[in-house]
Amino acid sequence: MKRPRLEHFKHPLRSAHSLLNILLISINRYKLISQFKNIPRIIRSKCWCGGNLAEYDMHKSYGVCIECGTYVNKCPPDPSKLTDIYGLDKYWHDRQRFGGHPSIDKRGELYRVDGRLDKWVEMVLKYGPEKGVVIEVGCAPGVMLKELELKGYDCVGVESNMDVVHWLRQNLQLNVHQGIFPEISLPKANLFLSFDVLEHSMEPLSFINAISEHLEPGGVAILQTAIDRYAVKPPFGKQFEKIFDDVEHTYIYTDKAIHRLIGNTDLRIISLDHRTSLAGELIVIGKP
């Protein structure tokens, strides 16, 4: 009688492994959804531009502005709870893990490997000043600010949660302030950076106006946010659920919305031509 060979068992083992992965993904998905299930929320019935909202049949939490096309979160978290949401444990450890993303201590390496950090540095070298003061709002995990510090810039970071601030100070020795922009005192800057933050802002017009107030004449700001400009349904394809996250993302923009947003300030658009990836579109604006 022949002994069973190892390969006879490989397929069942692969199947069991696949089922385990599916189960773990489902468990993490449940944890991600339930993590802030009971967080206090506010009701929003208008766009940041004042436009009325049409129903959006692809996500019940969002409406679509009939004026500028912005996707508007109709029930975002209460602003007073933002420092809790973006804490070191709840956000940078648990929420990232449940969503399948690296935690804060490993996120910087991801930015190096996937090319984001290189693209951001390239944008600074192409559009930004050769020296001066840099402000980065939402600077965790700190790799971009550290990179610019090593190039001789005078760097200032901002994070909303004090535990995250302590982590950045302790692990990267960065000058980081705690607060929610624009409700925080900061110096004037020659370069303003904010990657994947604008979509979180409760008041984007105040956010952009505050950028102008903090920029020296001739200063430049480089922002990254998801901009729906592609003939893809649902918007952003496989990243739809990640982008239409009604805990984190208050507004999701279109090119028309970005032009309107910047047009309401004294800043000028320099470029909308770059991106790090789908849903990682880059905005370059300058102060005359």
Task: Map each language-model feature to its residues.
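C-terminal alpha-helical "lid/dimerization" subdomain adjacent to the S-adenosyl-L-methionine
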Residues: I243-Y251
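Conserved N-terminal segment of class I S-adenosyl-L-methionine
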Residues: R3-F195, L205-N209, I222-Q224, K238-Q239, ...
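Helix-to-beta-strand junctions that scaffold the AdoMet/dcAdoMet cofactor pocket
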Residues: S201-M202, L215-P217
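A generic structural motif
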Residues: Y153, L267-R268
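Short "lid" loop at the C-terminus of a central beta-strand within the Rossmann-like core
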Residues: A226-A231
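A short His-aromatic
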Residues: D196, H200
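Short alpha-helix
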Residues: T250-T265
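Residues at helix C-cap/C′ positions in short coil/turn segments immediately following an alpha-helix
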Residues: L172, T265-D266
